[in-house]
């Protein structure tokens, strides 16, 4: 009788430990950041080199200033996009 209680307790503890690990893995996957859409504007002072440094600081490989056409009235601006 005592050994069966010990075995049941061991099984319950093992199941809780396994489910806890699976839960933490699921949380880690759901929290990962998605790549940003094109962010801040590129200007004469904030050029492609600055955009590249900005994106590398956000853990992306590179950044490029891309022409982004706005909605009417047409306001085209250069935006810093990370990839």
From Swiss-Prot:
GO cellular component terms listed in the entry, alphabetical order: extracellular region
InterPro entries xrefs: Defensin-like_dom (IPR056373)
GO BP field: defense response to fungus; killing of cells of another organism
Places the protein is found: Secreted
Keywords: Antimicrobial, Disulfide bond, Fungicide, Plant defense, Secreted, Signal
Keyword Disulfide bond part of the UniProt annotation: yes
Pfam families associated with the record: Defensin (PF24552)
Signal peptide: 1-22
Disulfide bonds: 38-82, 42-65, 51-80, 55-81
Family, as annotated: Belongs to the DEFL family.
Name by which UniProt lists this protein: Putative defensin-like protein 66
Organism this protein belongs to: Arabidopsis thaliana
């Amino acid at each position: 009788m005592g050994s069966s209680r010990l075995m049941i307790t061991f099984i319950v503890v093992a199941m809780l430990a396994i489910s806890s690990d699976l839960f933490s893995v699921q949380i880690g996957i759901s929290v990962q950041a998605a790549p940003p859409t094109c962010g801040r504007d590129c200007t004469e002072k904030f050029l492609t080199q600055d955009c590249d440094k900005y994106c590398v600081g956000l853990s992306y490989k590179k950044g490029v200033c891309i022409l982004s056409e706005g909605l009417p009235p047409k306001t085209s601006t250069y935006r810093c996009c990370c990839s």
